[in-house]
Amino acid sequence: VQGHIGTMYDNGQKVTYNSQNIIDTVEPNNVKKVLVSSLSGLNALGQDTFCSETESAKEIIAMKGNDNVKLLPLLSCQPGIAQDTTVAEKLLDKNKFYGLKFHPSNTNKAIKDNFDIYSKYITLAEKKGLPCVFHSITDGKSDPVEIIKLAEQHPKHPIILYHIDLASQPEQMARTIDNISSSVKAGKSNLFIDISWLTNLWDNAEQNKNTIKQALKKLGADRILFGSDTPITEMGNRDNYGKFADFVEDTVKEFYTDKPKEGEKALNKIFYDNAEELFINKNWFNAKSQPSKSKALLIGVGVGIAAIVAIALKCLHGADKTVENSPSHVSKK
């Protein structure tokens, strides 16, 4: 799901990534589409790496994929640094973005201290039909409990927690998954999770496996998205990327040991279909924006029988949208 270009500090060291770094990592693993955000637009005000929403948008719009890998831009947003959504709205009006990205930890603008402006950005996303993705970690800034509160202010809008609750202890991770599950099952929110960087990828393999299984049990495959954070650190290596993808696949198959067909469906959802629906097909948004048949008929009242019949036929026999590049199975490298 997620990739990055741009500049940031990682463990005190300034690093810069570009689109070719992503392509070199994912192309050998048969990845066709990557959602990408600008790290430059997710830095704190005052840092030498800080880049405004406008300038970081230029950076992300200018990136290029190739014939095999499409790079789909997310708008890096700065609630708290920006006091309103004016700039973001203009950028969305003029350019094609697939979602809004928030990183309260890196921008140093805690959700709890800037709740109203974060909510305004989500209101803008609702208007534009764009999912919102949050860096999620219990650190006082990007806390999952605060993201859940935001989501419950916008109960129909899809919001994705990257990393679920990054690097948290098993008990804390379980609580976060339970909180997300409770909110969704109560109809209070439309939350999803991404399973990148749950903990250190290799040293805590068993813990990562348990987290994925807990998520499958509590949330189901419909609300889980594969993610990698490519090309940051280990995920800038194509072999490690493939190793992690295989790890996720093996874990899901293990969870569905007695139901292999369900396991295959779950893998399709996690690796492809969920992201395709949320960010590209967007039936969740199109359904809201289309008038109902009854409303369409009411529009024709007073215009004449022929007009009413024409509208009814259009409503009843509208062409179905074709799903582009819908995967039928999990591709192995």
What would you call each of these model-derived segments?
Residues 1, 36-38, 74-76, 101, ...:
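Active-site neighborhood of phospho(di)ester-bond hydrolases with catalytic His/Asp-centered motifs
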Residues 1-33, 218-225, 234-311:
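Mid-to-C-terminal alpha-helical segments outside catalytic/metal-binding sites
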Residues 3-4, 12-15, 20-46, 69-78, ...:
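Divalent metal-dependent hydrolysis catalytic cores, especially in the metallo-beta-lactamase
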Residues 7-17, 41-52, 77-85, 107-114, ...:
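Acidic-and-aromatic substrate-binding clefts and catalytic sites of carbohydrate-active enzymes
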Residues 47-140, 190-192, 197-200:
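Active-site gating/metal-coordination segments in enzymes
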Residues 112-225, 234:
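Catalytic pocket-lining loop regions of alpha/beta-barrel enzymes
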Residues 125, 193, 229, 267, ...:
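Conserved, mostly hydrophobic/aromatic
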Residues 318-333:
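Non-Sec secretion/translocation targeting segments of pathogen effectors
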